[in-house]
């Protein structure tokens, strides 16, 4: 098959000959993703996404391939790009492109390519046609959503592109300027057709909520990240397995006996700290929130500041979703051969730009660099400060991603089939009964038996026998 297969014209992938390998791994992943497979079985005949044109911006992995094929099985037309320049699994991209689905994703693509690909996933039909652009966005980190909003603003006021704050913004702004020079109403036409967006991750949700608060959000939005079966599983249990996998694939370092600093003790930080401790590292945590700091202390982690820890620890992991968590000054103070990495969405948690400005770089292998300071000291930076688990590893296991992607699929169905239930410009979460449904779909795979309430028990605690079992305020 791979010897004669030609790369589709409406795609940008590394190597179509990898499609057969990708297809074999997709088949394995399907056996580990019961939620998505059950949704296919339940909804395929009904075709609830027939007529949906979904622009997908999410890591192009084997697990994402199962999501894409689930959306297609439910009737959707899909165009896809990765949301990170290092996270693509090229064999997964090839397998999906080989089926005729447009895919624009290459591991190690440039930022120029990245924003070109993100533009191309919005081109569904001829200019001016009813199906010119998408009517749904499935986003991870909010870049596809950002592109529509920023581009539409720039159509009316080019000054919004005048002062980029980073190299990535410079490239993004240049891409928007080039598109506007080619087609001055491209963004407004595309955005006008979009019903809504479903957002996968914490960083993207922050962006949505910020736009909603300002009254500038153009679409309806569902916050998939804060579904319990996403944040308490993907963010915690997924990171618990994929963080150390990425670090060890990149460095072959012994974790035991090392001092590891985890910046942030949210769900991602909790999973990361547990993983490092399980391999017998001494784990320290930095936190801004007194509640999270107290949680970390009660779990036996030493809570410190980055300033205090910088010259003492061996491994540093950022998990916060904030910027400048590890600064150039912190890294100047670190030990020789300290390992620095990030498992938050964007690379600005670590001041990588200042390392590029002031230090020499020596590539050890793809996504593993020695950063050499003027005094000769070296630190090891993984994935250039981007997601270490996807840049240096293969990301979260299939099973936990089935939880997340089942939520994404249900959210897409909800917004597409019931847009009248969601106000434009507002951000929603899926109702509790759908969260519980996603959990139910995964119990059999792990051999879990669910106890059923009697009528008397249900009446005693005041909940329906079939759920929902907890109020929305319950924290799990």
Swiss-Prot record:
This is Adenosylhomocysteinase. The gene is ahcY. Its cofactor is NAD(+). One of its GO terms (cellular component) is cytosol. Its EC number is 3.13.2.1. InterPro entries: Adenosylhomocyst_ase-like_sf (IPR042172), Adenosylhomocysteinase-like (IPR000043), Ado_hCys_hydrolase_NAD-bd (IPR015878), NAD(P)-bd_dom_sf (IPR036291), S-Ado-L-homoCys_hydrolase_CS (IPR020082). It is found in: Cytoplasm. It comes from Acidovorax sp. (strain JS42). It is an enzyme of class 3 (hydrolase). May play a key role in the regulation of the intracellular concentration of adenosylhomocysteine. One of its GO terms (biological process) is S-adenosylmethionine cycle. It catalyses: S-adenosyl-L-homocysteine + H2O = L-homocysteine + adenosine. CDD domains: SAHH. Pfam families: AdoHcyase, AdoHcyase_NAD. Its main location: cytoplasm. Pathway: Amino-acid biosynthesis; L-homocysteine biosynthesis; L-homocysteine from S-adenosyl-L-homocysteine: step 1/1. Binds 1 NAD(+) per subunit. Keywords: Cytoplasm, Hydrolase, NAD, One-carbon metabolism.
């Amino acid at each position: 098959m791979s010897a004669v297969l030609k790369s589709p014209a409406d795609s940008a992938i590394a190597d179509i000959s990898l499609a057969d390998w990708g297809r074999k791994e997709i088949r394995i992943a399907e056996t580990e993703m019961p939620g998505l497979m059950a949704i296919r079985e339940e909804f395929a005949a009904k075709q609830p996404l027939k007529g949906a044109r979904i622009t997908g911006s999410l890591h192009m992995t084997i697990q994402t391939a199962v999501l894409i094929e689930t959306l297609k099985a439910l009737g959707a037309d899909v165009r896809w790009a990765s949301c990170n320049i290092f996270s693509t699994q090229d064999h997964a991209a090839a397998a999906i492109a080989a089926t005729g689905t447009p895919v624009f994703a290459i591991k190690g693509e440039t930022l120029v390519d990245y924003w070109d690909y993100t533009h191309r996933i919005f081109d569904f039909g001829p200019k001016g046609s009813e199906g010119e652009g998408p009517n749904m966005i499935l986003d991870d980190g909010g870049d596809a959503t950002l592109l529509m909003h920023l581009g539409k603003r720039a159509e009316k006021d080019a000054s919004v592109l005048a002062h980029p704050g980073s190299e990535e913004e410079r490239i993004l702004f240049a891409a928007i300027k080039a598109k506007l020079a080619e087609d001055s109403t491209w963004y407004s036409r595309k955005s006008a057709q979009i019903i809504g967006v479903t957002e996968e991750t914490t960083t993207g949700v922050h962006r949505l909520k910020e736009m909603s608060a300002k009254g500038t959000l153009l679409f309806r939005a569902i916050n998939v990240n804060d579904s319990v079966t996403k944040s308490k599983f993907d963010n915690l249990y997924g990171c618990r397995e994929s963080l150390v996998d990425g670090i060890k694939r990149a460095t072959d370092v012994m974790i035991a006996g090392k001092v590891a600093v985890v910046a942030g003790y949210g769900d991602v930080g909790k999973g990361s700290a547990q993983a490092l401790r399980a391999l017998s590292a001494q784990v320290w945590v930095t936190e801004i929130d007194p509640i999270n700091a107290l949680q970390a202390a009660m779990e036996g982690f030493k809570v410190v500041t980055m300033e205090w820890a910088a010259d003492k620890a061996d491994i540093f992991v950022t998990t916060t979703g904030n910027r400048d968590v590890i600064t150039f000054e912190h890294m100047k103070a670190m030990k020789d051969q300290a390992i620095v990495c990030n498992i938050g969405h964007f690379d600005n948690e670590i001041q990588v730009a200042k390392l590029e400005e002031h230090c020499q770089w020596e590539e050890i292998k793809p996504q593993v660099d020695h950063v050499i300071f003027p005094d000769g000291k070296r630190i090891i930076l993984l994935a250039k400060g981007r997601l270490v688990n996807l840049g240096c590893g293969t990301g979260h296991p299939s099973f936990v991603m089935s939880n997340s992607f089942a939520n994404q699929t249900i959210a897409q169905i909800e917004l597409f089939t019931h847009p009248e239930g969601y106000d434009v410009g507002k951000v929603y979460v899926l109702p509790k009964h759908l969260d519980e449904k996603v959990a139910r779909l995964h119990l059999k795979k792990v051999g879990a038996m669910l106890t059923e309430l009697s009528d008397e028990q249900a009446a005693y605690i005041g909940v329906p026998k079939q759920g929902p079992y907890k109020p929305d305020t319950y924290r799990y």
